[in-house]
Amino acid sequence: MEYELVHEIKNHCPNNQMRDVFIEEVETDDPAAFVRERLQGRIDELTVAERPDGVTILAVCDGLCHEFNFTL
């Protein structure tokens, strides 16, 4: 399945509130497996939320919160 992926890395440091945002088109049948592969097994916590138009995955990795929004 082809998705538009918005990957946002949230920065909670008090002196740097900028966010890193990456947008790309990806093809995958399993968004959670895609995220696990992308973050190379460094995930401390993974939450998956199905939406009518896609999937949102929150991953805590190396102390940072990554939000992956897969939209059809």
Positions of the model-derived regions?
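Short, mixed-charge low-complexity intrinsically disordered segments
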Residues: Q40-L72
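N-terminal acidic leader/helix
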Residues: E2-D29
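Short non-domain terminal segments
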Residues: D20, A32, H66-F68
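Hydrophobic beta-strand residues in large extracellular and virion-surface proteins
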Residues: Y3-L5, V26, V35, I57-L58, ...
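Short, basic/low-complexity N-terminal boundary segments at the transition from targeting/disordered tails
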Residues: E24-I43
